[in-house]
């Protein structure tokens, strides 16, 4: 088995209201069951998720946090506005967002945007992936999957990798439970993070900084599905999330 990862070249700087599906189709002829992987930054820009830092007024909680961690209270307020729980305050803010994604700074980006502005992530990345996928299918006449990605750190390793934050017509997790291993033993715990693995592969071509390519197409890896899927299928249930439990205990001890 083999598959291709194709960087879609000549994607221009994206602004509010830009037609991403048309731009993608203009620069690459899509094929049936392609997986279109798109950086959340350009999805957010097209959706107008750009805000001036000077327009944000910090509240009491943001001001208190700023006094403890030395960050700009306006930036903290922006993070809090997108968060339902703060797990770590410093040296960075680790939060669970309103959408259920656990990440640094609620996914708010200060890079790849003009000074003095903040780029918020898509409000509902599954919905963004769905809109993008449906429009791409209409334009191309092909059956397609879409993954919206962001770069995430890892809890126990240095460095960032691509991670899926929104999906369309692709199952995010492959369950191997019940299958047999090389020695005939039945697998009892085996779940493969397909969407994250594909996001990581795409991130190798996307790159970072000024040379970034925000759209990559995976071709030849057929994981298309007709049913509706959601990124929350990848989130660990609260009762199983020992890292969050540990961070909450640590917070209580600090308080």
From Swiss-Prot:
Cross-referenced InterPro entries: F420-0_g-glutamyl_ligase, F420-0_gamma-glut_ligase-dom, F420_ligase_CofE_arc
Top-level class of the enzyme under EC nomenclature: ligase
Catalytically driven reaction(s): oxidized coenzyme F420-0 + GTP + L-glutamate = oxidized coenzyme F420-1 + GDP + phosphate + H(+); oxidized coenzyme F420-1 + GTP + L-glutamate = oxidized coenzyme F420-2 + GDP + phosphate + H(+)
Cofactor: Mg(2+); Mn(2+); K(+)
Amino acids binding a divalent metal cation 2: 151, 208
Pathway: Cofactor biosynthesis; coenzyme F420 biosynthesis
CC cofactor note: Binds 2 divalent metal cations per subunit. The ions could be magnesium and/or manganese. Monovalent cation. The ion could be potassium.
Organism superkingdom: Archaea
Alphabetic keyword roster: GTP-binding, Ligase, Magnesium, Manganese, Metal-binding, Nucleotide-binding, Potassium
SUPFAM superfamilies linked to this entry: CofE-like
EC number from the UniProt entry: 6.3.2.31, 6.3.2.34
Keyword Ligase: yes
Record keyword Lipid biosynthesis present: no
Disulfides per UniProt: none
Protein family according to the UniProt entry: Belongs to the CofE family.
Function: Catalyzes the GTP-dependent successive addition of two or more gamma-linked L-glutamates to the L-lactyl phosphodiester of 7,8-didemethyl-8-hydroxy-5-deazariboflavin (F420-0) to form coenzyme F420-0-glutamyl-glutamate (F420-2) or polyglutamated F420 derivatives.
Subunit structure of this chain's protein: Homodimer.
Protein name stated in the entry: Coenzyme F420:L-glutamate ligase
Source species of the chain: Methanosarcina barkeri (strain Fusaro / DSM 804)
